[in-house]
Amino acid sequence: MSKMEKEPLFSAKNLKYLTGPFSANNPVIVQILGICSALAVTVQLKPAIVMALSVTVVTAFSNLVMSLLRNGVPSRIRIIVQLVVIAALVILVDQVLKAFVYEVSKQLSVYVGLIITNCIVMGRIEAFALANKPWASFLDGIGNGLGYGLILVIVAFFRELFGSGSLLGYRISPESGYMAEGGFYSNCGLMLFPPMALIIVGCIIWVHRSRNKDLQEK
């Protein structure tokens, strides 16, 4: 009797779990999840990148742990177990940030702790990890975390560039070009206000849906 062939770790099916959230199933611009942090942490690019990586780590490993435990956790207490797993991972991530990137950790402040309530993390556990194998769940978590992070980075790129004239804290716009120095340019202070994050996300959604007819409402 021939043995069943094992599915490759990076089969086409598994790669779809990893790459799908970048476009067709993006948690922010398709599922409209995680919008609050898009407002809070995208004034500068560095905090946005750190937040994106933090959410990716938490989503990936919470998916993995809950997939491993899925057959041993009674349905009536699954939400409590999920919250405990997510909270433990968030605390670990928070301590790592304080140890290695303390200044960015101070900028993110309470928003790292609020990853516990991020609907993307809990949503992927409920929708995917509890019904799929650990490896697929891990890839799904990475994909959704990076898909979420991609939008944060895009929003932060435009807000920091046009709002502060810098990227990653390094000045891009030359001093001589500013009005105060006799030039013609001035930073757009409106980009630093939270509503601009919503407007930029709205523009991204518009561009994305205009290029993907399957997402357009009939």
Task: State where each predicted segment sits.
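C-terminal ends of transmembrane helices
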Residues: 62-75, 122-132
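Short, membrane-exposed interhelical loops at transmembrane-helix boundaries
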Residues: 168-190
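Cytoplasmic-side transmembrane-helix entry/capping segments in multi-pass membrane proteins
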Residues: 73-86, 107-113, 140
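Short amphipathic alpha-helical coupling elements at transmembrane boundaries
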Residues: 20, 67-71, 75, 136-144
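Membrane-interface capping segments at transmembrane-helix boundaries
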Residues: 8, 207-218
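Structural signature of hydrophobic alpha-helical transmembrane segments
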Residues: 45-61, 81, 105-116
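Hydrophobic core segments of alpha-helical transmembrane domains in multi-pass membrane transport
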Residues: 35-39, 55-60, 87-94, 116-120, ...
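Transmembrane alpha-helix boundary signature
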Residues: 92-107
